[in-house]
Curated annotation (Swiss-Prot):
Protein name in the entry: Lysine--tRNA ligase 1
GO CC list: cytoplasm
Entry EC number(s): 6.1.1.6
UniProt-listed HAMAP family: Lys_tRNA_synth_class1
Pfam families: tRNA-synt_1f
MF term (GO), any: tRNA binding
Residue window of motif 'KMSKS' region: 276-280
Gene: lysS1
GO biological process terms on file: lysyl-tRNA aminoacylation
Keywords: Aminoacyl-tRNA synthetase, ATP-binding, Cytoplasm, Ligase, Nucleotide-binding, Protein biosynthesis
Superkingdom per UniProt: Archaea
Segments carrying motif 'HIGH' region: 30-38
Family affiliation: Belongs to the class-I aminoacyl-tRNA synthetase family.
Length: 537
């Protein structure tokens, strides 16, 4: 049975069964390149937030950068010198490029810029600042006092034994700066301090405010309570039986006296044949990199069109164009107020768009053709865009699309999507039949007589050649000095591509031909129609 209500609206309806204010939260650890797999979490949260607002809910949307998490290991993209920083909060690890305040900002800055380009504008929290500001102090105190109760919950839900020396709080060593090698030896609730001993040999006392952090399975429910989170998307790994959401539900209720947020569990985005994306394994296409290739609204559409619980197969090469085509067809139906467009499709389109981002009208595939015809020259591109019937008023948006296409051609385009316009009649024209050459001469005459022709008209004209009695068929017959010839349009398209590109195939013919000035086509086709290798020599 086809869906009639978008998943974001279903979530909003469920959430609104609980009255009051709503806080949609999302959080990602900026430990490496934040990839489009991570993007699913933020776009999902944004869609739920917008659906709540559309229903008049009192709602906020926040993003928490978990930059107080430790550096887990020396990732493949790091030099071995980072071994000494393993175990330190990533907000206190040096920036890999030396230009950002710290390691976490190196990955966070491009991610936040990518969110802006996607039209996503949450309130941004940084975990290290939250801890230092004392936002977690009461939660830390409660966790330390109720350590045994939390341990019991963890054992009952996860089925794993909690070590006797386990503590819900990881102090940061004053000597080595690590939070993964310390053990709590005592705490003072009144002074709000924690005593510890570290594997480096140092022991000391740290304040609860900024002197360390709660372990993940306690930090998450503590955050729900501290901030009042009511909705949160998260990956399926956290939703497994006995996983962090299951333990979090018990902890937030029994330890902190709050309700857990409405869960939106999402599946992974799979990168081609390489599997699920992961910053730590290097199977990744960063959001920033992808925004250099694809318009923002298409990336939003990739997430919005699919229910969170279904995995998404993503391939930035040729299959990407299928996604782009889908979105552009939706855009066209919406623009034309197509009666066949139902409310479900309209909702997908609405949630894929966002204010503050470019909405170019030119189809991506058509720009792939235009870019290569113009050899990347922006002024020529603008001329072709105008000649193709599109507005050139918003040059900024056109330039963004041009940049997307340029990068896609450079990084991902399969060989058959690439071409170059030959400056002279290609030698391959010698392989054309007499009928094909006659067609080129006749086509040149027809273009000259008609003047300006649209892409669609070019396409229809070529196909008209097979119709006996059509103007083009008659002109071909005159060139060959025969009665109405039998014509296969496939041979004619081959002649067009061969005469311009020196190859037997190319982009969609209508778009392709309308990208050229008529004089170029007339001259090229006439030259090709009389071409012979001897003549060229």
């Amino acid at each position: 049975m086809a869906d009639t209500i978008h998943w974001a609206d279903v979530i909003a309806e469920d959430v609104l069964n609980k009255s009051g204010k709503h806080l949609v939260a999302t959080g990602i650890t900026p430990s490496g390149h934040i990839h489009i797999g991570n993007m699913r979490e933020v776009v999902t949260a944004d869609a739920a937030y917008r659906a709540l607002l559309d229903r008049g809910a009192d709602a906020r949307f926040i993003y928490i950068a978990d930059n107080f998490d430790p550096l887990r290991k020396v990732y493949p993209f790091l030099p071995e010198s980072y071994a000494e920083h393993v175990g330190k909060p990533i907000s206190e690890v040096p920036c890999p490029c030396g230009e950002c305040a710290n390691y976490s900002e190196h990955f966070l800055k491009p991610f936040l810029e990518a969110l802006r380009r996607l039209g996503i504008n949450p309130e941004v929290y940084r975990a290290d600042e939250m801890y230092r500001a004392g936002m977690y102090t009461e939660a830390i105190k409660t966790a330390l006092v109720k350590r045994n109760e939390i341990a019991k919950i963890l054992e009952e839900v996860s089925g794993k034994t909690v070590a006797e020396e386990w503590s819900p709080f990881n102090p940061r060593c004053n000597e080595c700066g690590k939070i993964t090698t310390t053990k709590v030896t005592g705490f003072d609730p009144d002074a709000e301090t924690v005593d510890y001993v570290c594997a480096c040999g140092h022991s000391g006392t740290v304040p609860m405010a900024g002197g360390g952090k709660l372990t993940w399975r306690v930090d998450w429910p503590a955050r729900w309570a501290v901030l009042g989170v009511t909705v949160e998307p998260f990956g399926k790994d956290h939703a497994s039986r006995g996983g962090s959401y299951d333990t979090g539900k018990r902890i937030v209720r029994e330890i902190y006296g709050h309700e857990p947020p409405f869960p939106i569990v999402y599946e992974w985005i799979m990168l081609g044949k390489q599997g699920a994306m992961s910053s730590s394994t290097g199977v990744v296409v960063s959001i920033s990199d992808m925004l250099e290739v694809v318009p923002p609204e298409v990336l939003r559409y990739l997430i919005i069109r699919t229910k969170p619980e279904k995995h998404i197969q993503f391939d930035p090469a040729q299959p990407l164009l299928t996604i782009v085509d889908e979105y552009e067809r939706l855009r066209e139906k919406f623009r034309d107020n197509d009666p066949s467009m139902g409310e479900f499709e309209k909702r997908i389109y609405e949630l894929s768009r966002a204010t503050g981002i470019c909405h170019p009208e030119i189809p991506f595939k058509q720009m792939v053709t235009i870019f290569q015809v113009a050899r990347g020259n922006f002024e020529q591109i603008l001329q072709i865009v105008k000649r193709s019937g599109f507005s050139t008023e918003d040059e900024k948006c056109i330039r963004e699309l041009v940049d997307n296409v340029s990068k896609w051609l450079e990084l991902y385009a399969p060989p058959f999507a690439k071409f170059s316009v030959k400056e002279n009649v290609p030698v391959q024209v010698a392989t054309l039949s007499e009928l094909q050459k006659a067609f080129l001469g006749a086509f040149a005459d027809l273009i000259e007589s008609k003047g300006k022709i649209s892409g669609e008209e070019y396409h229809m004209l070529v196909y008209s050649a097979k119709e006996k009695g059509s103007e083009l068929n008659r002109l071909i017959a005159e060139k060959l000095n025969v009665p109405a010839p039998q014509v296969d349009p496939k041979d004619l398209f081959k002649a067009i591509y061969t005469s311009i590109l020196g190859q037997s195939s190319g982009p969609k013919a209508g778009w392709f031909l309308s990208s050229f000035e008529e004089d170029f086509l007339i001259n090229r086709f006439r030259e090709a129609s009389t071409y012979s290798p001897e003549k060229r020599e």
